Amino acid sequence: MSRLQDFYKSKVAPDLQAKFGYKSTMEVPRITKVTLNMGVSEAVADKKVIEHAVSDLTKIAGQKPVVTKTRKAIAGFKIRENYPIGCMVTLRGQRMYEFLDRLVAVALPRVRDFRGISGRAFDGRGNYNIGVKEQIIFPEIEYDKIDALRGLNISITTTAKTDDEAKALLTAFSFPFRN
């Protein structure tokens, strides 16, 4: 069991149950999955770009991502149907907790001019999204070996019913919110 998962079961879950007055431990919000998505629009011109994005995301997540393809052709963007346009990976269980631990403790503090993450990026149903501008904030990515700086979206899906419950959950996991 990872450090963060153990911390959730021993400290976070009982605290949230007391704070929100849940009758059952199954009502307590928990993180169900973390989805990492990297959109690579340059892949239209150069097919090798998608391979670099896949290798970067594999290093970051510790799991091979699936290549996302376009659903329909759009002439204005010069894309055809089934063109590889990005990659995504879904983390659950132990890998998810280990990734979140690395994200909060190592990666986010390495962001340039970091003052905390926005407390307004909740979707109204208890899920949270973080946009990362550069993949080099993760220690697994070596600066000398990357071909271009790429951003990625991190979606944290929880079982929380409201944004307040989700924010309390993520704050308990020591996410550095600025507001």
Swiss-Prot record:
Gene3D superfamilies recorded: 3.30.1440.10
Species assigned in the record: Bordetella petrii (strain ATCC BAA-461 / DSM 12804 / CCUG 43448)
GO cellular component terms, A-Z: ribonucleoprotein complex; ribosome
Protein name: Large ribosomal subunit protein uL5
Function comment: This is one of the proteins that bind and probably mediate the attachment of the 5S RNA into the large ribosomal subunit, where it forms part of the central protuberance. In the 70S ribosome it contacts protein S13 of the 30S subunit (bridge B1b), connecting the 2 subunits; this bridge is implicated in subunit movement. Contacts the P site tRNA; the 5S rRNA and some of its associated proteins might help stabilize positioning of ribosome-bound tRNAs.
tRNA-binding keyword on record: yes
SUPFAM superfamilies tied to this protein: RL5-like (SSF55282)
Highest taxon listed in the record's lineage: Bacteria
Summary of subunit composition and partner proteins: Part of the 50S ribosomal subunit; part of the 5S rRNA/L5/L18/L25 subcomplex. Contacts the 5S rRNA and the P site tRNA. Forms a bridge to the 30S subunit in the 70S ribosome.
GO BP terms: translation
Matches recorded under InterPro entries: Ribosomal_uL5 (IPR002132), Ribosomal_uL5_bac-type (IPR020930), Ribosomal_uL5_C (IPR031309), Ribosomal_uL5_CS (IPR020929), Ribosomal_uL5_dom_sf (IPR022803), Ribosomal_uL5_N (IPR031310)
Keywords: Ribonucleoprotein, Ribosomal protein, RNA-binding, rRNA-binding, tRNA-binding
NCBIfam families: PRK00010.1
Family: Belongs to the universal ribosomal protein uL5 family.
Pfam families found in the cross-reference section: Ribosomal_L5 (PF00281), Ribosomal_L5_C (PF00673)
Gene Ontology molecular function, alphabetical: rRNA binding; structural constituent of ribosome; tRNA binding
Keyword Hydrolase belongs to the record: no
